[in-house]
């Protein structure tokens, strides 16, 4: 599959999740039997987090970037691949009325779901925009912090994603990412498997390549945690790990 075909596969899958429910792993069997709430608890979300905006928690993450993001009141935060808004709303609690969270997602259905959740739960400091994280609908140097949870692996051109992230961050800006990376290369048939592509595996890069692109875009970074046991828990032994990092301009 070429990049356009991969994007279409991912877009259709997440449209389906937004409208019908389910998870990114439906049909792929990689997430086990955990509910969205239980998966979030296993990733370190508190019970208060899980209960705060339950309709926004679709169980699509591989970490909890709001837990290690150094957010403060007044920050302007960008959530790359915001989905139904779960992490965006948790970030909004941290930045308060003086701050703002902008969520960007490629699927109109997810954006609408997030907007509906914002109204339902009374979040006025969150805005959701439809857009491609490879070409962000934001001005240069306009955000203080970027968060992203298991999304960058889905983008065919990760170099563009990192360049765009660098572009929109203010001087001194920070990015906190939880994402899937490969520990060894996948065979071609798995790289083109639609379920694994939408399930955050087939589009993942080798860890060294991922970090190299981050550096090439201009970022300094620090790896905060690596979880290779996620392979056994959720991905049927495939050579992947959940990587958590902080990057800065």
Curated annotation (Swiss-Prot):
Changing residue 31 to S: No change in activity. It catalyses: arsenic triglutathione + [thioredoxin]-dithiol + S-adenosyl-L-methionine + 2 H2O = methylarsonous acid + [thioredoxin]-disulfide + 3 glutathione + S-adenosyl-L-homocysteine + H(+); arsenic triglutathione + 2 [thioredoxin]-dithiol + 2 S-adenosyl-L-methionine + H2O = dimethylarsinous acid + 2 [thioredoxin]-disulfide + 3 glutathione + 2 S-adenosyl-L-homocysteine + 2 H(+); arsenic triglutathione + 3 [thioredoxin]-dithiol + 3 S-adenosyl-L-methionine = trimethylarsine + 3 [thioredoxin]-disulfide + 3 glutathione + 3 S-adenosyl-L-homocysteine + 3 H(+). Keywords: Arsenical resistance, Methyltransferase, S-adenosyl-L-methionine, Transferase. It comes from the Archaea. GO terms for biological process: methylation; response to arsenic-containing substance. One of its GO terms (molecular function) is arsenite methyltransferase activity. Highly dependent on the characteristics of the thiol cofactors used, with some of them (coenzyme M, homocysteine, and dithiothreitol) more efficient than GSH. Its EC number is 2.1.1.137. SUPFAM superfamilies: S-adenosyl-L-methionine-dependent methyltransferases. It holds the Pfam family Methyltransf_31. Belongs to the methyltransferase superfamily. Arsenite methyltransferase family. PANTHER family: ARSENITE METHYLTRANSFERASE. Catalyzes the transfer of a methyl group from AdoMet to arsenite, producing methylated arsenicals. Involved in the conversion of As(III) to a number of methylated products. Reduces the arsenic toxicity in the cell and may contribute to the global arsenic cycling. This is Arsenite methyltransferase. It comes from Methanosarcina acetivorans (strain ATCC 35395 / DSM 2834 / JCM 12185 / C2A). The gene is arsM.
